[in-house]
Amino acid sequence: MSTTTGQVIRCKAAVAWEAGKPLVMEEVDVAPPQKMEVRLKILYTSLCHTDVYFWEAKGQNPVFPRILGHEAAGIVESVGEGVTELAPGDHVLPVFTGECKDCAHCKSEESNMCSLLRINTDRGVMINDGQSRFSINGKPIYHFVGTSTFSEYTVVHVGCVAKINPLAPLDKVCVLSCGISTGLGATLNVAKPTKGSSVAIFGLGAVGLAAAEGARIAGASRIIGVDLNASRFEQAKKFGVTEFVNPKDYSKPVQEVIAEMTDGGVDRSVECTGHIDAMISAFECVHDGWGVAVLVGVPHKEAVFKTHPMNFLNERTLKGTFFGNYKPRSDIPSVVEKYMNKELELEKFITHTLPFAEINKAFDLMLKGEGLRCIITMED
């Protein structure tokens, strides 16, 4: 048994004290895990755009002071009452959404949207008792999406922890706990392109490139990348993208351009930007009779999707997805195995590595649009 089991652990954490201000490295107290919770030692975390979005807090409920971070990998330090599936020393990925295994969603093979542990960006406390497990001088520091991985130790509900192969390199597979799995699963689990098919990917950021990687793994023969930034195409080739379309280069709607390129439309499309015009284009560019469009990007809350009903009546299908339709505990371990079996390449997503003390540099890189994923090493 760990000497820290049942004890408060004092450790370093990068605290967001207020919106848009640099994170501050603080000494925080991390309470022991309560019923159905685990305390994790975080070894590697990466920065996702969602962290930046809620750090800026321009359009959402500001919850501060807070410990952000949700893409990470670590080791179980201790477990709370009732936890039987995990033990100290297990290698794990904390996930921003969960799988209680008891609700109707968890019991359905068609859903990964757990009723109990579905992502909640406003909640800054644990669901067990409505309290935070983090504090500084007795004052609570709030959690973020149930994970808060910008801390050397964190407490997470057991349903939000995926136990993985202990041989998997944590500094690589940490990126699978959010964006990469979201894009990959959108293609493999929802769009389901067949070998030799054509796929259009809208948005060539990390999630879009993960969707392209899924199309490459599925054996698509044409992978058309759509982005307003022409400089992204060279990098996209590494992920299987064969052609590039910049909507700014054409006077006609991009869906018409793609339809002309592909003799009536692509077999599948995956939209990863969240811009409503791109969503409409992604749907209208798929072939009638069998085309499937999948929406991944999160739109503005006032956005309205408009298309003519004949696009549906002509047998086009529109689908949405959340976290690539992966159930965190049941499915993410198998995604790690795809990497271990060399089916999935993760190294090309990782463009920067920084020590924990320089975490604010990772925010700067993302705000400048430089790189894809920056791995933050927690131990010096």
UniProtKB/Swiss-Prot annotation:
Q: Where does Zn(2+) 1 bind?
A: C48, T50, H70, C178
UniProt-recorded name of the protein: Alcohol dehydrogenase 2
Name the Enzyme Commission number(s) assigned to this protein: 1.1.1.1
Q: Where does NAD(+) bind?
A: 50, 203-208, 227, 232, 273, 296-298, 323, 373
List the Gene3D superfamilies. Answer: Medium-chain alcohol dehydrogenases, catalytic domain (3.90.180.10), NAD(P)-binding Rossmann-like Domain (3.40.50.720)
Q: Which GO terms describe its biological process?
A: alkaloid metabolic process; formaldehyde catabolic process
Which cofactor is essential here? Zn(2+)
By sequence similarity, the record places it as follows: Belongs to the zinc-containing alcohol dehydrogenase family.
Reaction catalysed by this enzyme = a primary alcohol + NAD(+) = an aldehyde + NADH + H(+); a secondary alcohol + NAD(+) = a ketone + NADH + H(+)
How does this chain assemble? Homodimer. Homotetramer.
What Pfam families is this protein classified in? ADH_N, ADH_zinc_N
